[in-house]
Amino acid sequence: MGTPFITFLAPSKLDGYKRGAPLDEQPPNISQTFLDAMEVREEVFVKEQKVPAENEFDDDDPRSCHWVVYASINKVDTLEIRDEEGNIMQPRKSSTRSTPIGTIRLVPFPHDPHPENGGKYWNGVLEGEDKHKNGEENGDASKASSDKPFIMDRKTTFHNGQEPYVKLGRLAVIEEFRGRRIAGLLVTTVLGWLRDNPSYFDPSIKEFGLGQLDQVMGTDMKIPQWAGLVCVHAQAQVVEFWKKWGFEVDEEMGTWWEEGMPHVGMFQRLEIGEKTVRLD
């Protein structure tokens, strides 16, 4: 394996993406980088962890930033063939492909409410809840995600219920490349990017709109600004890995199940310095 390299994908509309359909059947407007991210996610979450294929793509994907790590993999396409006298009848041929081996995404605020302690979620919907009430169905994902409101959430150990935070997720590495610090490379890359781009997701006054501004001014918060808080909904089995990267378990957030797997909330705060409100 050659030296891994990482590609960044900014939020994309992903219009027409077919949930659960094979990657080679997706419309041509879908970025190859996103298809590569989904190739890794489907290998890890769908094939290994048995998450339903139609649940792997969700309404946060269009509004998220995605990173994909690649490795240059040499593959033998044609074996060498010799005759009885040792003469080469068919030469050996090989090719090198930049193969996606890991991915991660960064979801901006606002978010859905914190999961319920003890709750069981399937495709982001709590058991017994109407999956259509938030527009979350196999329709226009970009529209559903863009309509998320800023809300007052319940307080937890590290979140006061209203501070904007970003969320890391969909961290996945192909099995044969685990143990090579690929996951750590992805996480530290995203955290470094956040430190360098702390205002990336902050809405301007124009974008936020005066109507929403009045609504938020009823709380302690004015124009939503990210102040360095990063969240992870971590599978219970990988909590120790996230701790190595600076995250702490939010005990008051509790434990819940996503696609049958136990999860916990984890947070860390990055030092990002002073920021100003965007006007344009």
Predicted regions and their residues:
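C-terminal "cap" of GNAT-fold acetyltransferases
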Residues: Q237-V239, E248, T255-D280
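Conserved N-terminal entry element of GNAT/NAT acetyltransferase domains
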Residues: M1-Q32
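Conserved active-site tyrosine of GNAT-family acetyltransferases
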Residues: R41, W242-K243, F247
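Cysteine-centric segments in proteins
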Residues: G218-D220
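Fungal eukaryote-biased detector of long internal structured cores
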Residues: M1-G2, D15, Y200, L270-D280
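Conserved hydrophobic beta-strand within the GNAT/NAT acetyltransferase core sheet
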Residues: L168, V230-A234
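Conserved acyl-donor/pantetheine-binding loop and adjacent beta-alpha core of acyl/acetyltransferases
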Residues: N29, V40, V44-V68, K75-R180, ...
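Conserved short alpha-helix immediately C-terminal to the canonical SAM/SAH-binding motif I
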Residues: L186, V238-F241
